[in-house]
């Protein structure tokens, strides 16, 4: 089995694993790497099949998490953005002793809309899967544009995300399809009731993929977790609001 691409950066005494979202790679953290690297030892990861972690096919959430866990430090804060939030959450469920704190960013335990649950309509996710086989590049670009919609720096933020994708080899259609399948089918709402490490959830008020309506529902479901909504951010708050984003992580670190 191939190894996944993994880079450590910074010299802080606290380890922080950063997991990117669908279609992207670890370069997405470039704009906050310097700032965070002075406080943490960062573990920058390309998820299996993405970026420089080539040679992997489509995986289930459990398989993806097991692959990432192999390279991970014994103890770290695990931060996952969007799809990466599901991987970080799965890590907290399967290896709680290795997760000092769990941070999910613009992520949902159940991305797909269900009865009484806000999310992305399953037919939209299905549509993305269909379009992937028709026009691969265009579909990924549309998904990226959705992520920054509404922010004051939307155009610039979308360009940043696009440059991250283009900087590395594109994932295979099979891998992207597998990622959408995870977003469409996984539901960790009940399972995450049982995690007992510090748990911080960060959201963008303008996020079109992870609706803020779910925040109070999860506050009730997971009273042990803390939520923070960033007022002018959308789906990529670390790109549009890097200072506030880093501050939230420093505050978490000082509370551990």
Swiss-Prot record:
Q: Which GO terms describe its cellular component?
A: cytoplasm
* Catalytic activity, EC: 3.1.1.85
Give the residues the record marks as binding substrate. 22, 82-83, 143-147, 235
> What pathway is this protein said to act in by its record?
Cofactor biosynthesis; biotin biosynthesis
Q: Which GO terms describe its molecular function?
A: pimelyl-[acyl-carrier protein] methyl ester esterase activity
Assembly behavior: Monomer.
Q: Which family does it belong to?
A: Belongs to the AB hydrolase superfamily. Carboxylesterase BioH family.
Name of this protein: Pimeloyl-[acyl-carrier protein] methyl ester esterase
Q: Which gene encodes it?
A: bioH
């Amino acid at each position: 089995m191939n190894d996944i691409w993994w880079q450590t950066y910074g010299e802080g005494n606290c380890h922080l694993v950063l997991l990117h979202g669908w279609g992207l790679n670890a370069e997405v953290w470039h704009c906050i790497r310097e700032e965070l690297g002075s406080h943490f030892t960062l573990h920058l990861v390309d998820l299996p099949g993405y970026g420089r972690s080539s040679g992997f096919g489509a995986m289930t959430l459990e398989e993806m998490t097991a692959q990432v866990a192999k390279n991970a430090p014994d103890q770290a804060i695990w931060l996952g953005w969007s799809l990466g939030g599901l991987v970080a959450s799965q890590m907290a469920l399967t290896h709680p002793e290795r997760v000092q704190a769990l941070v999910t960013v613009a992520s949902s335990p159940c991305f797909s809309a269900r009865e009484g649950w806000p999310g992305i309509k399953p037919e939209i996710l299905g549509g993305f899967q269909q379009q992937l086989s028709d026009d691969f590049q265009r579909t990924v670009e549309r998904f990226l544009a959705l992520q920054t919609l509404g922010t004051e720096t939307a155009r610039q933020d979308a360009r940043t995300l696009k440059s991250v994708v283009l900087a590395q080899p594109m994932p295979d259609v099979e891998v992207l399809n597998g990622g959408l399948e995870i977003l469409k089918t996984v539901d960790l709402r009940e399972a995450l009731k049982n995690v007992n490490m510090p748990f911080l959830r960060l959201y963008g008020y303008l996020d079109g993929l992870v609706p803020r309506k779910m925040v109070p529902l999860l506050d009730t479901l997971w009273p042990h977790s803390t939520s923070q909504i960033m007022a002018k951010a959308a789906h990529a708050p670390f790109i549009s609001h890097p200072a506030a984003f880093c501050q939230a992580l420093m505050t978490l670190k000082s509370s551990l």
